[in-house]
Amino acid sequence: MPGIAYLGPEGTFTEAALRALQAHGLIPSTAPDAAGADEVTPIAADSTSAALAAVRSGDADFACVPIENSIDGSVIPTLDSLADGAALQIYAELTLDVSFTIAVRPGTAAADVRTVAAYPVAAAQVRRWLAAHLPEAEVVPANSNAAAAQDVAAGRADAGVSTALATQRYGLEALAADVVDEPNARTRFVLVGRPGPPPKCTGADRTSVVLQLDNVPGALVSAMTELAVRDIDLTRIESRPTRTGLGTYKFFLDFVGHIEDPPVAEALRALHRRCADVRYLGSWPTGDVVGAAPPPMDESASWLEGLREGRP
């Protein structure tokens, strides 16, 4: 059975996402000729970077990590870990609705709370609630939502922004439940493994790449044009520093379609020719079409294929 590293400890939203990926049959099997994994071995990691490092080292077959949320945007440690080091590939994604439990030790009242442990991504999603209900409390960083509950249980914080599961597991009580500033808060998680053949095209797919461009005028516009002229819907673009010098960046691109779609394949070839470096992060199913699907092979492609086969 595959070993899946995830942002631990037990009780995080990432563990819940891992279980949901398994329930939906989205975790590939490591056994030959098997369609999907019926059983998995969860491996708790201290950080998203550590979870991805476990895949690179072979200590885990896959990692389940958060990549984006609707409140605070991209999860930067995940992006940086995907862009640097040995190549990795995304095989599946899943989106969870997110709300938090404010966990406290039994008998603790709101007036007793002076410190609140919170994973930074979670803190951003409950900032207004904390300001309204615990205005005097200091927010201290935790390594994960479940680690925030552990900090409370160990007495390192008076309260923690955590999950209902972690609150129960660590013998705590809920000072407040279903806490979130935005009722439509959602987090997208991805399943990451070592490079291999991508999942089959479903018609509702996402492709992701990381581009490094030459430092010449119009380089980014030229790269984007390769998608635009093929009617490929770009759904996300984000820059991150290369860490090699000021003013140098890598660009993360998500777009609708699969490497098996002819327009996407053509665009990837063109980006490879045009850019200093292209890191392919994968093509995988999204479940629902997000954006406009790439156009089917048009009449001109059929005409060209006929010429190749001697049918003018």
Curated annotation (Swiss-Prot):
Reactions this protein catalyses: prephenate + H(+) = 3-phenylpyruvate + CO2 + H2O
CDD domains, A to Z: ACT_CM-PDT, PBP2_Aa-PDT_like
Coiled coil: none
GO function term, MF aspect, one: prephenate dehydratase activity
GO biological process terms, semicolon-separated: L-phenylalanine biosynthetic process
Site feature Essential for activity, where: T187
Keywords: Amino-acid biosynthesis, Aromatic amino acid biosynthesis, Lyase, Phenylalanine biosynthesis
InterPro entries found in the cross-reference section: ACT-like_dom_sf, ACT_dom, Chor_mutase/pphenate_deHydtase, Preph_deHydtase, Preph_deHydtase_CS
Record-linked Gene3D superfamilies: 3.30.70.260, Periplasmic binding protein-like II (3.40.190.10)
Annotated metabolic or biological route of this protein: Amino-acid biosynthesis; L-phenylalanine biosynthesis; phenylpyruvate from prephenate: step 1/1
Top-rank taxon, per record: Bacteria
Region feature Disordered, mapped onto this chain: 291-312
Protein's name according to its UniProt entry: Prephenate dehydratase
Lineage: Bacteria, Bacillati, Actinomycetota, Actinomycetes, Mycobacteriales
